[in-house]
């Protein structure tokens, strides 16, 4: 497992305690299956934290099985932005998940999965308490300015503005298509 995954234990424990929840006195074992697939990233923190809260009786553990959770937990209990939310939500939708709890800062990107009105219900939260409230059906405060737009309207120059330099333009197109750096 990556260092980020190994550090998640402390992030989750501190986040739960600093949010006013108890943490189990006994050892907590979390199985991330399938074991043969390498786990990396902090996007599993929220799912693990909610699993612990469900096991401790803070939430209905059976109801939690129907909800997808994405997000990193800070030491203070905030639910932090993660990368790659859109493909995760699309994968959850394909697996039959109808509700997804995610960081408020990822909401704009996640809403791309709901274009045309389809896709899972999205519950954007800022901290662990809001996450618990959301899964219990309580109203959470509007996100307001906390939500960062995923797509910005920007006017970009394009290659029609450049005369000549055909080899350089072709190299740039190939580099971008392959997600390679240009510099």
Features from the language model and the residues they span:
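Peripheral, non-AAA+ core regions of ATP-driven protein-machinery
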Residues: 1-183
């Amino acid at each position: 497992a990556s260092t980020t995954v190994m550090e998640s234990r402390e992030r989750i424990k501190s986040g739960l305690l600093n949010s006013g929840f108890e943490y189990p006195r006994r050892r907590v074992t979390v199985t991330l299956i399938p074991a043969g697939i390498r786990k990396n990233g902090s996007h599993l923190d929220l799912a693990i934290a909610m699993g612990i809260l469900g096991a401790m009786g803070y939430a209905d553990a059976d109801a939690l099985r129907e909800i997808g959770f994405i997000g990193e937990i800070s030491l203070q209990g905030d639910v932090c932005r993660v990368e790659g939310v859109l493909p995760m939500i699309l994968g959850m939708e394909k697996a039959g998940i109808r509700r997804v709890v995610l960081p408020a800062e990822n909401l704009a990107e996640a809403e791309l999965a709901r274009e045309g009105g389809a896709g899972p219900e999205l519950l954007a939260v800022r901290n662990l308490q809001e996450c618990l409230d959301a899964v219990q059906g309580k109203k959470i405060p509007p996100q307001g300015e906390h939500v960062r737009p995923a797509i910005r309207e920007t006017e970009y120059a394009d290659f029609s503005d450049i005369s000549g330099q055909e080899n350089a333009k072709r190299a740039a197109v190939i580099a971008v298509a392959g997600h390679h750096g240009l510099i």
